[in-house]
Amino acid sequence: MIVCWRTVHVPKVERDRFRAWIEENRRLREEHGILFELVLGRSARQNPAKTLQPSDPESGEEGDLVVVTAWASHDAFDSWIETPDRDRLTDSDVHRSVGYCPITRYDVVGGYLNLDGISAVAEFPKEEP
């Protein structure tokens, strides 16, 4: 399994549409082998003082999100990149409104997922007005 990490710059006014676009295209991505896709936004709550601190946050007006996806293999991901279905998805106003950094691939070399625990606490915060 591989995990792909990509920073994306989504203007604040486009964030709801971007998240909806991800969800609307979920089925198609799953048909092409995606295992999961998460969109991460920097939390206002950061580390306690006794731990290493993150750098200053980005502007409150616009900022970066991180998109994390998982695929069964490099071949599965490469097949997705080459499919005309992906080309159709990226030919949209929502996709063009976002700034994309390069994708970095990571091989999964260890760890675990507690799926029952994730299901029990899953909540997705709404964007503040």
Language model regions located:
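Active-site-flanking beta-strand signature of metal-NTP-handling nucleotidyl enzymes
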Residues: 2-8, 66
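Hydrophobic beta-strand positions in extracellular immunoglobulin-like domains
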Residues: 8-9, 71
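Short, surface-exposed ligand-recognition loops at beta-strand->loop->(often short) alpha-helix junctions
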Residues: 9-19
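Feature marks short, surface-exposed loop/turn motifs that line or immediately flank catalytic pockets
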Residues: 12, 43, 74-75
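Short acidic, gly/pro-rich beta-turn/loop elements at beta-sheet edges
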Residues: 16-18, 77-79, 113
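An amphipathic, aromatic/His-enriched active-site/gating alpha helix that lines ligand/cofactor pockets
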Residues: 24-38, 54-64, 68-108
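Carbohydrate-binding/catalytic loop surfaces
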Residues: 43-55
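Acidic/histidine-enriched, glycine/proline-rich intrinsically disordered or flexible terminal extensions
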Residues: 105-129
